[in-house]
Amino acid sequence: MGRKRLITDSYPVVKRREGSAGHSKGELAPDLGEEPLPLSVDEEELELLRQFDLAWQYGPCTGITRLQRWHRAEQMGLKPPPEVHQVLQSHPGDPRFQCSLWHFYPL
């Protein structure tokens, strides 16, 4: 039986020169100077509702609307944010606002 072969026996080792031609380790990507666009009012409200969906201290959010969850949390004395209730009242028929983050995923 012969000696075990290593992968480097089949492929030559190529050492690359480190120098100023490329970037060295530890360099950060160049700053593009672009500022993120400010969110629209609807996007800010939807982000608030997403955060409400992800806050488990108000109970589970699958199978019920956000407004039902808000009312249930209030009845249980969990003190849900009043801003969430205001947003939900201002968009009564819009499923983007009324349905939870997980609504479109099958159970």
UniProtKB/Swiss-Prot annotation:
Region of interest called Disordered, as start-end residue ranges on this chain: 1-35
Pfam family of the protein (one): DNA_pol_delta_4
GO BP terms: DNA biosynthetic process; DNA synthesis involved in DNA repair; DNA-templated DNA replication
InterPro entries: DNA_pol_delta_4 (IPR007218)
Any one cellular-component term (Gene Ontology): delta DNA polymerase complex
Subcellular location(s) per record: Nucleus
Motif (PCNA-interaction protein motif (PIP box)) on chain: 1-16
Modifications after synthesis and translation: Ubiquitinated; undergoes 'Lys-48'-linked ubiquitination in response to UV irradiation, leading to proteasomal degradation. This modification is partly mediated by RNF8 and by the DCX(DTL) E3 ubiquitin ligase complex (also called CRL4(CDT2)). Efficient degradation requires the presence of PCNA and is required for the inhibition of fork progression after DNA damage.
Function: As a component of the tetrameric DNA polymerase delta 4 complex (Pol-delta4), plays a role in high fidelity genome replication and repair. Within this complex, increases the rate of DNA synthesis and decreases fidelity by regulating POLD1 polymerase and proofreading 3' to 5' exonuclease activity. Pol-delta4 participates in Okazaki fragment processing, through both the short flap pathway, as well as a nick translation system.
SUBUNIT field: Component of the tetrameric DNA polymerase delta complex (Pol-delta4), which consists of POLD1/p125, POLD2/p50, POLD3/p66/p68 and POLD4/p12, with POLD1 bearing DNA polymerase and 3' to 5' proofreading exonuclease activities. Within this complex, directly interacts with POLD1 and POLD2. Directly interacts with PCNA, as do POLD1 and POLD3; this interaction stimulates Pol-delta4 polymerase activity.
Family statement drawn from the similarity comment of this UniProt entry: Belongs to the DNA polymerase delta subunit 4 family.
Protein name: DNA polymerase delta subunit 4
Organism per entry: Bos taurus
